[in-house]
Amino acid sequence: MASALEQFVNSVRQLSAQGQMTQLCELINKSGELLAKNLSHLDTVLGALDVQEHSLGVLAVLFVKFSMPSVPDFETLFSQVQLFISTCNGEHIRYATDTFAGLCHQLTNALVERKQPLRGIGVLRQAIDKMQMNTNQLTSVHADLCQLCLLAKCFKPALPYLDVDMVDICKENGAYDAKHFLCYYYYGGMVYTGLKNFERALYFYEQAITTPAMAVSHIMLESYKKYILVSLILLGKVQQLPKYTSQIVGRFIKPLSNAYHELAQVYSTNNPSELRSLVTKHSEIFTRDNNMGLVKQCLSSLYKKNIQRLTKTFLTLSLQDMASRVQLSGPQEAEKYVLHMIEDGEIFASINQKDGMVSFHDNPEKYNNPAMLHNIDQEMLKCIELDERLKAMDQEITVNPQFVQKSMGSQEDDSGNKPSSYS
């Protein structure tokens, strides 16, 4: 092993033993070129370092190995990274979260290129747990995990990292990019869409669309298209975006989504045949955007919406009459829709198989059972927790030096503009 590499190993050991993590981070940031020049000796360097005691040194070596234009032995490197992430010292790597996240991004890209996304899911879950200060902290690796889960069509491993509300972002030594934030909410929305949790999906797409921005983002555009479709499926109309949404959404993103606005407009007429015609007209656009599946679900939701409207007019109705009024192919398809809607709790009804009559009922929920009271308690606790968080954030802003300086400056400006009472 070359003397420069030996010096690197000795410095890593010494600084790690002394607990001088800041200086160690400076060393590994400067050593990238040295390690890249000695690629053939890097496995020897790894053998000389202990993963637990010298986590930052091992991280630097693995990061450089993955940064090479071509990885000679991917399987060996994958095993090394997998072992490192599962056994490294979490306290140490939090000093170099930018490099650690960078290693995870490299691993993700390599697995995506090799069409092996499933292999990285468990590894990235461990990586996030090592990086996070708490479960409500968002890291750039969250987006990687969601991407792999989507590509592997294995959604559930991402849920523990999506079901929590994020209140903090891991800065990653200034390396955290807005792209990672947008991708987390866009991919997360797609995961929830795949699981048909449309309420949560709509929230995630909204977060991506309402992110403060000065320029058009392709991720925001795609989120906006899916936001329209999921709104129609869930609510039967397009939910209005909050007032704090960036002006670029109205100025640039809406004109780029004309086909989707047309779809929403036709949907509001409650006419399935017109909606089918519009879907045929814009099928190329919807297919290109990979949204045809959602568009078909919009059409299905319109049939359901029209069936729900019938419950407000009729107490009983034949399946044949229902199929005719809702523009379904026949009583069999009408029965299929009604059964699914009963199962999902979207309507309360029963079907008499003898005469093919559907009887509509009132909602049996009286809102007086223990489960309902428990739900109310849980919602109240969430409100109390939110109130406490807002107070803490308000206090944090109040003592922020920049805020104090700015508010003092504005007060001086105000007092300067007021005429003196003694003049």
Curated annotation (Swiss-Prot):
One of its GO terms (cellular component) is COP9 signalosome. It comes from Bos taurus (Bovine). The modification N-acetylalanine is found at residue 2. It is found in: Cytoplasm; Nucleus. Keywords: Acetylation, Cytoplasm, Nucleus, Phosphoprotein, Signalosome. Component of the COP9 signalosome complex (CSN), a complex involved in various cellular and developmental processes. The CSN complex is an essential regulator of the ubiquitin (Ubl) conjugation pathway by mediating the deneddylation of the cullin subunits of SCF-type E3 ligase complexes, leading to decrease the Ubl ligase activity of SCF-type complexes such as SCF, CSA or DDB2. The complex is also involved in phosphorylation of p53/TP53, c-jun/JUN, IkappaBalpha/NFKBIA, ITPK1 and IRF8/ICSBP, possibly via its association with CK2 and PKD kinases. One of its GO terms (biological process) is protein deneddylation. Belongs to the CSN3 family. The keyword Cytoplasm applies. This is COP9 signalosome complex subunit 3. PROSITE patterns: PCI (PS50250). Residues 402-423 are annotated as: Disordered. Component of the CSN complex, composed of COPS1/GPS1, COPS2, COPS3, COPS4, COPS5, COPS6, COPS7 (COPS7A or COPS7B), COPS8 and COPS9. In the complex, it probably interacts directly with COPS1, COPS4, COPS8 and COPS9. Interacts with CK2 and PKD. Interacts with the translation initiation factor EIF3S6 and IKBKG. Interacts with ERCC6.
